[in-house]
Amino acid sequence: MKKVLAAALCGAVMFLLPGCGGERLPYAREMGDMALMRTMGVDTGEGGAEQLHVTVSSGRRARGLQGEAEPPLVLSAERESISSAFLAMQGLSDSYVFYGHVDQLLLGEELSRRGILETLQYFSQDQELGMGTQVWIVRGGTAAEAISAEQERGVESRLSTIQTDSEMGMAGMTRTVGETLTSLMEDGSAYLPGLVPGEDGALLEAGYGVVKDGMLAGWLTGEQARGLELAAEQVGADILELETRGGGAAVRVTAVSVSCVPEFSGERLTGLELACRRSLRAEESWGEPEPAELCAAAEERETARISAALEQLKGWNADCLGLARRAGQMESARWNALRAQWPEVFPELEIQVTVQASLLAA
């Protein structure tokens, strides 16, 4: 019996050796020569709605003993699924392509208008990709173009800078895959930051794309984008230049809080009060402006911004700010009634916006 077992084991080992047995094992790349992909872009393919064009970029890489920087490795493939595109790109590189370090996801506008749920759900199901990946929509263009525009320097560096600036209150809001899926599940809609390539190829912030039922409904830009940030309690990268009778000042928002109070007639939702409190700090001033007048000017400007954003969201019937949930927290006993009525009443709901600003002492 021992001789039979030994013979079987010997045969198995011989089968696995190169040149022995019916087939060889696949050639194993050197794991030291690994391409760590950092950014992924997804667009609709040229082959039609059933095709996806997937682009990945590694960022600048270090090679050799001196760690010389090499240009990013950019690969792309068009297939019917992301997983099949990944497999196809594996064969396009001499390095082992590893997707577990992808932390930036770019979505083309055409794909976003057709639907992004399948792409986001792939990140939630794949073992290598993560829910903490940052998501962006390329406004008026494709993800492949955005990645190629920054190919020399690497798009990863620019996206990481915007993300860091956002955390420091020096850029707009960012969203992760997990946050976006949660908003779509709980609120039926979500906002995602937009990007456009600048004249020198560097990616620039371009407002927010509002996604409803998994598809891009439209864009909030300019004053509407600033209003969205305020209503979301985000301290954005914005300087308000205010004029009063005695002079003016450039002020920055340092803190913001928002309460959302529903108004009922019986069990019928009739209105919503959105109250915003803001703390301001004067960065510079000219003349002799009165603090009270500066606060009043800021309140008027910010009320108009928030109202403009809300009117557009009502037009799309897209509650990407989670106003229903926030109002339900104030009236938990009426949450079921509020949730049932919300999709019907939100487009015509009267929302009263009030802003109270306070100027911090210099």
Language model segments and positions:
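Membrane-proximal alpha-helical signals and transmembrane carboxylates
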Residues: 2-362
